[in-house]
C-alpha cells in the first residue's frame, strides 16, 4: 500500500495505524487464499512441476525486494548472506512460493527492531536456503505438529498476525516435488531457522 510510505504525521497517527492494520489483514487473507488454492491443486494432481534453469540468488533477491516494506513496518531488517550465483533446475513459481512463505513467516514471528537473516549456500550438491528470525519461536509440542498434514497447527505472530500452518505444508510439498527437503530448528522465546534444499544444476 503506497500510502504507508508516507510519514505518519502526514495522515495522522491514528489513521496511519488503521491503514497499517488494514494492509496487513489484506495481505494475510490474500496469502491464505493463494496458499489454499495452490495446496488444493497440488493435492488433486493439477499442479505439475515445470523445470527450468534458475538462479536462486535472483529469486530470493526479488522476494526480499517485495517484503522490505512489510519488514520496515515492524522495524525489521532483512539481511542476506549469499554467493554471486546459485544455479538450480526447478519450478520457478514453486520456488518463489516457498521463499515468499518462509520470509513472510519470519517477519510475522519476529520481534520489532530485530533482523531476519536469509542465507544461501551450495552444500553437497544442493542449493540450501535458510531463513532465520529472532522472534517467539515454537515450543516442543508445536514442533511435533508442524509439517504434518494430520495435525492442525496454527499460532499468532508478534503483532497478533494469524498463521494457519498451511503455508509450511505447501512449502514442504513444493520442495519435495522439486527433489529437495524442508527442515527447521526452533527454540521458544528465541526464534526459528527454516531451511530448504533443491538440487544444483548439473
Where is each model-derived feature located?
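Conserved catalytic submotifs in the C-terminal HATPase_c
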Residues: 16, 50-55, 72, 77-86
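Helix-loop junction within the histidine kinase core
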Residues: 40-51
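A conserved beta-strand-to-alpha-helix junction within the catalytic ATP-binding
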Residues: 50-65, 96
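Short alpha-helical segment of the dimerization/phosphotransfer core of two-component systems
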Residues: 22-29
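Short helix-loop "hinge" at the ATP-lid/N-box region of the Bergerat-fold HATPase_c
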Residues: 106-107
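Short helix N-cap motif at coil->helix boundaries in the Bergerat
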Residues: 56, 137-148
Amino acid at each position: 500500500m503506497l500510502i504507508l510510505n508516507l510519514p505518519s504525521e502526514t495522515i495522522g497517527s491514528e489513521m496511519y495505524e488503521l491503514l497499517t492494520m488494514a494492509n496487513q489483514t489484506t495481505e494475510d487473507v490474500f496469502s491464505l487464499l493463494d496458499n489454499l488454492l495452490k495446496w488444493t491443486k497440488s493435492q488433486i494432481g493439477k499442479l505439475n512441476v515445470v523445470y527450468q534453469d534458475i538462479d536462486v540468488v535472483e529469486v530470493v533477491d526479488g522476494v526480499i525486494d517485495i517484503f522490505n516494506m512489510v519488514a520496515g513496518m515492524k522495524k525489521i531488517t532483512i539481511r542476506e548472506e549469499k554467493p554471486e550465483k546459485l544455479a538450480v533446475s526447478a519450478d520457478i513459481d514453486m520456488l518463489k512460493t516457498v521463499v515468499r512463505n518462509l520470509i513472510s513467516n519470519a517477519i510475522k514471528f519476529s520481534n520489532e527492531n530485530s533482523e531476519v537473516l536469509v542465507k544461501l549456500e551450495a552444500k553437497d550438491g544442493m542449493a540450501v536456503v535458510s531463513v532465520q528470525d529472532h522472534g517467539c519461536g515454537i515450543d516442543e509440542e508445536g514442533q511435533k505438529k508442524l509439517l504434518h498434514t494430520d495435525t492442525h497447527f496454527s499460532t499468532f505472530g508478534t503483532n497478533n498476525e494469524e498463521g494457519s500452518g498451511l503455508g509450511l505444508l505447501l512449502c514442504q510439498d513444493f520442495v519435495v516435488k522439486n527433489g529437495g527437503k524442508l527442515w527447521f530448528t526452533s527454540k521458544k522465546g528465541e526464534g526459528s531457522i527454516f531451511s530448504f534444499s533443491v538440487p544444483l544444476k548439473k
